[in-house]
A protein has these predicted regions:
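Nucleic-acid nuclease catalytic cores
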Residues: 94-217, 221
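A generic signature of intrinsically disordered, low-complexity regions enriched in glycine/proline
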Residues: 20, 35, 45, 87, ...
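Acidic-basic catalytic patches of nuclease active cores, encompassing PD-(D/E)XK
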Residues: 76-100
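Charged, glycine-rich intrinsically disordered N-terminal tails and low-complexity linkers that flank
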Residues: 1-81, 85, 151-156
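Detector for methionine-enriched segments
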Residues: 1, 30, 34, 76, ...
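Generic secondary-structure transition motif, activating predominantly at the C-termini of alpha-helices
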Residues: 14, 21, 25, 60, ...
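Short intrinsically disordered terminal tails
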Residues: 1, 225-226
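Alpha-helical structural motif
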Residues: 52-56, 82, 86, 165, ...
Length: 226
């Protein structure tokens, strides 16, 4: 990803942030672009999967139509509520303070958003001097699964959607490392409340992501003319 094509924006309100990003492919949805076409689709010359095309159409409708009302499940609300506490725990674990210059919590002081070539964008939860951080606050049983089965070696297979999210954000922030943090304060033992995994930049996957972004952008621009 060319550094000269990366832009950083800070929005005062969440509505401004949402409005700006609604026509862009985002890190959190990147895995939808990465799905491989079926054998039949490939035989027909298709390079984007049905799921990827559905995502493209969703972005187009976000631009051309009135936005639909957002729905927040209890799990999503829980995650949003616990994230600040997770950030504080992370800072403590790293010997940092949330006000340190090399510990940037991207939801404080405005909504940060990185954009690549006006085509895709994303924001990690925390930016460190040498890494970014992606924080998840899942249900307790999911957190336990992560702690038991997910590690640096298999996260690309176990959590492919988060893996692609992190790879895209690493490119946007020009970092070679991402810390994946799962946090659940409901566990009685403090050490069981946190699961931290170091994920390295996967240059091959990152190139594949960039290729899919270009393909999807071309398709989106063509469909916008219809």
């Amino acid at each position: 990803m060319e550094t000269s094509k990366i832009e950083r924006f800070v929005f005062e309100t969440q509505d401004d942030w949402k409005g700006f990003r609604k026509g862009l492919f985002t890190s959190s949805q990147m895995n939808r672009l990465m799905a491989s076409p079926t054998k039949k689709e490939i035989e027909l010359g298709e390079r984007l999967s049905k799921g990827a095309k559905t995502y493209i159409l969703e972005l187009i409708s976000n631009v051309e139509a009135e936005p639909k009302k957002e729905f927040y499940s209890s799990a999503m609300e829980w995650g949003n509520e616990q994230e600040p506490q997770a950030v504080l725990r992370l800072a403590e674990m790293l010997g940092k303070d949330v006000t340190d210059n090399d510990f940037i919590y991207t939801s404080i002081g405005g909504f940060v958003f990185f954009v690549y070539d006006k085509k895709s964008g994303g924001t990690p939860d925390v930016i460190l001097s040498d890494a970014i951080v992606e924080i998840k606050c899942p249900d307790s049983h999911t957190h336990r699964y992560y702690r038991t089965f997910v590690n640096s070696d298999n996260i690309s297979v176990e959590l492919p959607d988060y893996y692609d999210q992190m790879q895209h954000n690493m490119m946007l922030c020009q970092k070679d490392t991402c810390l994946f943090m799962s946090f659940d304060p409901r566990y009685k033992e403090a050490k069981k409340q946190v699961h931290l995994i170091e994920v390295k930049a996967d240059k091959i996957r990152q190139e594949q992501i960039l290729e899919k972004i270009e393909l999807a952008h071309e398709q989106k621009e063509a469909w916008l003319l219809l």
